[in-house]
Amino acid sequence: MKASELRSKDAAELGQELESLLKAQFGLRMQKATQQLANTSQLRNVRRDIARVRTLLTEKAGK
C-alpha cells in the first residue's frame, strides 16, 4: 500500500488497517513456520506496510 493512499485516511481507519495488517502478518508467519508460504517476500511487504501505518499514526497524534 502506498503512503499517499494511507495519508488520506483518518486515525480510526488507520487503526483498522493496522489491525488487519497485524493479523495478516501473523497468518504469514504461521504459513512460513509450517513451510506453506511460497512467496516469502509477502512478509517483508506486510512488515513495511505496518511500519508505514504506525508512522502515519504517530504523525497524526502529534498534530
From Swiss-Prot:
<dbReference type="InterPro" id="IPR050063">
    <property type="entry name" value="Ribosomal_protein_uL29"/>
</dbReference>
<keyword id="KW-0689">Ribosomal protein</keyword>
<dbReference type="GO" id="GO:0006412">
    <property type="term" value="P:translation"/>
</dbReference>
<dbReference type="InterPro" id="IPR018254">
    <property type="entry name" value="Ribosomal_uL29_CS"/>
</dbReference>
<dbReference type="InterPro" id="IPR036049">
    <property type="entry name" value="Ribosomal_uL29_sf"/>
</dbReference>
<dbReference type="GO" id="GO:0022625">
    <property type="term" value="C:cytosolic large ribosomal subunit"/>
</dbReference>
<keyword id="KW-0687">Ribonucleoprotein</keyword>
<protein>
    <recommendedName>
        <fullName>Large ribosomal subunit protein uL29</fullName>
    </recommendedName>
</protein>
<dbReference type="InterPro" id="IPR001854">
    <property type="entry name" value="Ribosomal_uL29"/>
</dbReference>
<dbReference type="GO" id="GO:0003735">
    <property type="term" value="F:structural constituent of ribosome"/>
</dbReference>
<comment type="similarity">
    <text>Belongs to the universal ribosomal protein uL29 family.</text>
</comment>
<dbReference type="Pfam" id="PF00831">
    <property type="entry name" value="Ribosomal_L29"/>
</dbReference>
